[in-house]
Structures are given as structure tokens and as C-alpha cells.
């Protein structure tokens, strides 16, 4: 079933691209292909694998939050930041809130001064610029997932990534440039970096008014019989 769904998705994308060509719109259209989470690999039949990344959908490890991203832009496309070149691969960090300011730039529309924009324009990497700096990226996952994921939050800043697990209060720190599979927690060896990222994470949660989970002392869940 899973393989059939992947095949159907591939066919659907092909149908969209073929239709754009038939309508003469392929050289006037930007196509963005991505996903809302990593591949399903830890539950519900474990139909696939995200190796070398750890875990999958429903988890704060890279297997759960690192998704494919393909941006198809006609060569020579003029954005407000310059002419877009073909850029086969970029290792720039991008998150979904970055799409809005990026699309505005690609279609030549300036953002309204009163608009609040959480994301960052990533046309730079599409232009081949190597000096693009995204800054910290955050995730807030205050609930359990049916794939086995636990409540927590994460922040990535450059090569460093910190995860805070709400149930246990434990924090994990990883260097993704040398450990993309998140096998080696280096929080104890780099306590200053751990504390720095944890402070940034908590400040971000406060700034956005993140809803935090709390223990339900009256829960009867442990008495349920399935």
C-alpha cells in the first residue's frame, strides 16, 4: 500500500508538470515540492527507513523533521533579489515558514510593512549565494504521537541541535555536521552550548506564547483496559 501511494504521488506530480507544459505555463511557474514530516518508519507497519537519519514521522530526531525539498524554477527567472540560476543542490537550512517571503521575492512582490513574517527569504541559495545564514530554527511538539514520539521541543542553530524532552526533562545535544544520525549526545561535553541553545529555545517559546503540556494528576488512563 505504501509503495502504491508513493507511485501515485509520483504520477500526480508528473501530471501537474505535463499540464503546465501543455498550457504553456511551465516557463512561468515555480513549483515547490516538499513534505510536512519525515518518512514513516517507527510505527504503523514501519513501511520505510530514513537511515542514516534517526527515527521518523512523529519524532523530533532528524528522521522526523528533515523533509525533501525541491524548488523547480525556470532558468533565468527574475526575482526581486536577482536572476535565478540552476542550483542542483543546496545544504541551506529551510523551514516551511520561509516559503511565504521566498515566494513574494520570486514573484516580485514586496512584503507589506505591517505584515508579520516569521520566515526568511531563501532566494539567496537559489541564486547560488554561499553566505546565506538562516539563524536558529525551532520545533514545538507538546503531545504524544501515535508513531511513538514523545512531547518535546528542539532548536537547530548551524550544525548544533538541541532537543528537550518534556516528560523526563532531559536535554540532548548533537553535532549534525559530524553526527547526522544523532547517535552521540554531547550535552555533557558541551554544557555551555547546551545551556545557550536551551535559553534560546525557552525565549522563543515565551515569545510565541507556546502552549506547554502539564501533568494530569487526575488521569484514569492507567486504569483503562484495551
Predicted regions: what they are:
Residues 25-31, 66-67, 133-134, 158-160, ...:
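Loop/turn elements at helix/coil->beta-strand transitions in domains of secreted/extracellular proteins
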Residues 8-45:
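Metal-dependent active-site segment of extracytoplasmic phospho-/sulfohydrolases and closely related
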Residues 184-192:
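Active-site-proximal N-terminal segment of extracellular/periplasmic enzymes that hydrolyze or transfer
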Residues 39-60, 72, 77, 82-88, ...:
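C-terminal cap/loop subdomain of S1 sulfatases and analogous C-terminal strand-loop tails that border
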Residues 133-135, 201-217:
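Bilobed periplasmic-binding protein-like "clamshell/Venus-flytrap" ligand-binding domains
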Residues 1-4, 8-15, 24, 48, ...:
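Extracytoplasmic/secreted proteins, especially bacterial periplasmic and envelope-associated proteins
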Residues 18-25, 104-109, 127, 191, ...:
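Sec-exported extracytoplasmic/periplasmic mature domains
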Residues 2, 6-9, 13, 30-35, ...:
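Beta-strand elements within well-structured catalytic alpha/beta cores of enzymes
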